[in-house]
Amino acid sequence: MSSIPSPFCTVFLFLAAFLQTVEAVPDLGNAGTQVAKPNEIVRSGRNIHVGVDAKTIQEAIKMAQPGDTIHLEPIVYRDYAGFYGKKGELGKPVIFDGHGATLEGSDPIDLEKWREVEPGLFANDALLPRLDEAILSRWFFVWNGEMNHMGRTSKGKKAPFKKLQDLQPGEWTFVVDTERSQASSKQLFGTFYLKIPPGEKLAAANISAPMRSAGVQLSGDNAHLIIRNITATHPYNDGFNIHGDCRDVVFENIRAIECGDDGISAHESAEYRVEGLVSIGNSTGITDTVAAQTSYKNVFIADCHAYDLFFLNNGRYKLENAVVWSTSQHPLTIDAAANERVELDLENVLIRRADKTEPALVQKNATLRAARLTLENMEMTVRGVASFENCLVNGKMLPEGVVATGADKASLIRQLVPSAYQAKFRQP
């Protein structure tokens, strides 16, 4: 990765201090696959070093057996980590340790595949081997180190693609090929366009495109895994994309920075816990769906575009010790369909709304249990069920008639908020 603009670069520098603040999280207590406690884990397997013992990350994951530890170097890898039906054993997990590595989802554009159709306007008819509406809705370019969405985000508002004649230097657009894109198929065909100042070389614009869908991806039946000390940035989908039926999976000290969709997202019947998460500049900070069961502790979320916290369907979710700097369209939404029931526990959570007020939403068929919750510059709308213990919602004490102090703000800000964001929490 060439660079990540301030304040994002500060997040990486914050790693050393952040690692020292993370506490152990009790297991979820899910039925089925047993969950190992930290003192029950056996460290007796092999050490597999990517680049030495295995040529690639995927080769290392494939060869890892219960008790083995995969090691990355603290460098940038233009690669991803995919776990597909990977299982350790109770007390002998497969450990994937990034040691501060970054999984970069974007690649510099191939200049030979972009043709100049008029001065400063470049076109590419085949940027990806396959394109559909889901990918296009998440799409962005990294332009001289900065993420360029053109006012579009996957789970939020999407500005119409600009017409070619309206495109300004530093902007991009997409034009659908209606003859090739058939209504019966989800596949899209068309042309991406990049606009730079006439006379400037395309190479000088320093543009990258997201060529991988995720930083870390789980699919199928995975069990007894520990994934830690890793940053995912610039995939067109999720930083950490968790599908399938995983059990006894732990993420420790992970970061999702500027991802096209969710920082981290659980799907289907996934069960995992996260002990230390930084999620910045994504479409959503956390989005968990279907029947997943997840637990997050020691979390910082900021500068997301659509949702900061989005919990859906029939899942059971918990968030503890968290700070959110909310600039998104929706700070907190808990939602379920008529035949579903979603539940969320919040404990010691601070959400500060930065600008335009937008309420937290507990929709019908949703249950919120909140303890030591503080919401600042925002209200809460409850259409489902909500219970409160020692909470402050925009200065209002909940439950009513009981003195409340809310989240432990001083401790949360000191321990979880990167230095680049500290000043935002010193303001009233």
Residue ranges and their predicted role:
Residues 206, 222, 229, 234, ...:
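Extracellular beta-rich repeat passengers
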Residues 9-20:
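Bacterial N-terminal signal peptides
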Residues 99-100, 107, 268, 283, ...:
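Residues at the C-termini of beta-strands that transition into short coil/loop
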Residues 1-11:
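Bacterial N-terminal signal peptides that target proteins for export
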Residues 83, 112-125, 180-182, 209-217, ...:
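Extracellular beta-strand/beta-solenoid scaffold signature
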Residues 26-234, 241, 411-427:
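Extracellular polysaccharide-degrading/modifying enzymes targeting complex plant/algal/animal polysaccharides
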